[in-house]
Regions:
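Amphipathic alpha-helical interaction segments
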Residues: 27-35
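N-terminal intrinsically disordered, cationic/polar leader segments
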Residues: 4-12, 17, 23, 37-43, ...
Length: 59
């Protein structure tokens, strides 16, 4: 995915989350993550992405 595609997909996600509303955002993101995990199909790659995502947020 190039930079423009990444920006387009991020923008699409932002609009979709706005459309469903703040109260449903976490559920939509959780569902999206589960769907992407299935499509990636590589447990170590998904685990590494989880580690990257939480970096800087852990106490």
């Amino acid at each position: 995915m190039n930079a423009q595609e990444l920006d387009d997909v991020y923008t699409r996600l932002a609009y979709a989350l706005t459309e469903v509303g703040e109260e449903k955002t976490s559920m939509v993101l959780a569902r999206l993550v589960l769907l992407l995990m299935q499509r990636v199909g590589d447990a170590s790659a998904v685990s590494a992405a989880i580690d990257d995502a939480v970096e800087g947020f852990r106490p």
